[in-house]
Amino acid sequence: MSLSNETKAKIVADFGRDANDSGSTEVQVALLTAQISHLQGHFSEHKKDHHSRRGLLRMVSQRRKLLDYLKRKDVSRYTGLIARLGLRR
């Protein structure tokens, strides 16, 4: 259920400051968004997988915390990121 290394590298290249920038807030949010999207497809087929649903809720909570942090620190980066990812708020 995790993302492939190629997908992760592409996300890091798209959202990071350079090819090795895997720790910036934007990259972390983008990776979590990709994992959340992947899990949503999983739940359409496996409706009773409550163990994975708990992991999904944890990822959503972590993404929310990172977005709140980014909004506090730099509003322009926050608005640009949610526009690029197509998130609400």
Swiss-Prot record:
It holds the Pfam family Ribosomal_S15. One of its GO terms (biological process) is translation. Keywords: Ribonucleoprotein, Ribosomal protein, RNA-binding, rRNA-binding. GO terms for molecular function: rRNA binding; structural constituent of ribosome. CDD domains: Ribosomal_S15p_S13e. Signal peptide: none annotated. GO terms for cellular component: cytosolic small ribosomal subunit. It comes from the Bacteria. PANTHER family: RIBOSOMAL PROTEIN S15, BACTERIAL AND ORGANELLAR, SMALL RIBOSOMAL SUBUNIT PROTEIN US15M. One of the primary rRNA binding proteins, it binds directly to 16S rRNA where it helps nucleate assembly of the platform of the 30S subunit by binding and bridging several RNA helices of the 16S rRNA. Forms an intersubunit bridge (bridge B4) with the 23S rRNA of the 50S subunit in the ribosome. HAMAP family: Ribosomal_uS15_B. Belongs to the universal ribosomal protein uS15 family. Part of the 30S ribosomal subunit. Forms a bridge to the 50S subunit in the 70S ribosome, contacting the 23S rRNA. This is Small ribosomal subunit protein uS15. The gene is rpsO.
